[in-house]
């Protein structure tokens, strides 16, 4: 018998259909961690769709669709999932841009419903009382005053450029804020960073 004689023709009907695998592949390390956690008698918490861990005011870590377990004795939680870095300032800027575009579109078309659908700014303002709106406006005017101070070019004489760059990177601030902070703290980089991160 030759190899050519052994080859049989297979039709599509004879090929078994592979079902789509909807199971999640779990890594070996995660499987070991889950086995250890199962020995701790943790209770699975249902209904949590997002976990947010705050690092600083501007930066947060978000875990979407996590598996959350709670200890039976205390108020401690164990969270499984992939953490993603999320920049709060970028998110806020994107929301402001979207709200501004929605207001501009509403002004051009004269339609209030489009602005309400695109941005929830109107609904948020309608639900606030006048005192909180006034407080928000005062806070916004104070931040505009701080921004105006930043726009004026600060004098960097007597300060090292490397110190200014270090403060800018670590505190995530503008060059003018870094210069003003270094002058306020007598060129002390550590105290300046701590002061600007508050």
Swiss-Prot record:
The keyword Nucleus applies. Its main location: cytoplasm. Residues 159-198 form the UBA domain. One of its GO terms (cellular component) is cytoplasm. GO terms for molecular function: phosphatidic acid binding; phosphatidylinositol-3,5-bisphosphate binding; phosphatidylinositol-3-phosphate binding; phosphatidylinositol-4-phosphate binding; unfolded protein binding. Keywords: Cytoplasm, Nucleus, Protein transport, Transport. It is found in: Cytoplasm; Nucleus. One of its GO terms (biological process) is cotranslational protein targeting to membrane. It holds the Pfam family UBA_HYPK. Residues 48-113 form the NAC-A/B domain. Component of the nascent polypeptide-associated complex (NAC), a dynamic component of the ribosomal exit tunnel, protecting the emerging polypeptides from interaction with other cytoplasmic proteins to ensure appropriate nascent protein targeting. The NAC complex also promotes mitochondrial protein import by enhancing productive ribosome interactions with the outer mitochondrial membrane and blocks the inappropriate interaction of ribosomes translating non-secretory nascent polypeptides with translocation sites in the membrane of the endoplasmic reticulum. Part of the nascent polypeptide-associated complex (NAC), consisting of EGD2 and EGD1. NAC associates with ribosomes via EGD1. Belongs to the NAC-alpha family. This is Nascent polypeptide-associated complex subunit alpha. It comes from Yarrowia lipolytica (strain CLIB 122 / E 150) (Yeast). The lineage of its organism: Eukaryota, Fungi, Dikarya, Ascomycota, Saccharomycotina.
């Amino acid at each position: 018998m030759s190899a050519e004689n052994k080859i049989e023709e297979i039709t599509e009907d004879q090929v078994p259909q592979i079902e789509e695998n909807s199971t999640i592949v779990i890594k070996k390390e995660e499987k070991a961690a889950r086995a250890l956690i199962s020995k701790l008698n943790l209770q699975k918490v249902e209904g949590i769709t997002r976990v947010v861990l705050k690092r600083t005011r501007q930066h947060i870590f978000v875990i979407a669709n996590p598996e959350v377990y709670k200890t039976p004795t205390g108020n401690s939680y164990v969270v499984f999932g992939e953490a993603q870095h999320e920049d709060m300032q970028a998110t806020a800027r994107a929301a402001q841009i979207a709200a501004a575009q929605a207001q501009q579109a509403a002004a051009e078309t004269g339609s209030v419903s489009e602005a309400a659908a695109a941005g929830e700014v109107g609904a948020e303002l309608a639900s606030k009382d006048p005192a909180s709106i006034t407080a928000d406006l005062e806070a916004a005017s104070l931040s505009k005053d701080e921004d105006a101070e930043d726009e004026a070019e600060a004098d960097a004489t007597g300060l090292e450029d490397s110190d200014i760059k270090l403060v800018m990177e670590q505190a995530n601030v503008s060059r003018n804020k870094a210069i003003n902070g270094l002058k306020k703290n007598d060129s002390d980089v550590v105290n300046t960073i701590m002061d600007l991160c508050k």
